[in-house]
Amino acid sequence: ESIASFQGVLDGKYD
């Protein structure tokens, strides 16, 4: 789920 994590970073949810 590397993509999912990356998307989180882009969305600003993955701090």
From Swiss-Prot:
GO terms for molecular function: ATP binding. The keyword Transferase does not apply. GO terms for cellular component: mitochondrial inner membrane; proton-transporting ATP synthase complex. Keywords: ATP synthesis, ATP-binding, CF(1), Hydrogen ion transport, Ion transport, Membrane, Mitochondrion, Mitochondrion inner membrane, Nucleotide-binding, Translocase, Transport. Its EC number is 7.1.2.2. It comes from the Eukaryota. GO terms for biological process: ATP biosynthetic process; proton transmembrane transport. It is found in: Mitochondrion; Mitochondrion inner membrane. The keyword Translocase applies. It catalyses: ATP + H2O + 4 H(+)(in) = ADP + phosphate + 5 H(+)(out). Mitochondrial membrane ATP synthase (F(1)F(0) ATP synthase or Complex V) produces ATP from ADP in the presence of a proton gradient across the membrane which is generated by electron transport complexes of the respiratory chain. F-type ATPases consist of two structural domains, F(1) - containing the extramembraneous catalytic core, and F(0) - containing the membrane proton channel, linked together by a central stalk and a peripheral stalk. During catalysis, ATP synthesis in the catalytic domain of F(1) is coupled via a rotary mechanism of the central stalk subunits to proton translocation. F-type ATPases have 2 components, CF(1) - the catalytic core - and CF(0) - the membrane proton channel. CF(1) has five subunits: alpha(3), beta(3), gamma(1), delta(1), epsilon(1). CF(0) has three main subunits: a, b and c. Belongs to the ATPase alpha/beta chains family. On the 2D-gel the determined pI of this protein (spot N153) is: 5.5, its MW is: 55 kDa. This is ATP synthase subunit beta, mitochondrial. The gene is ATPB.
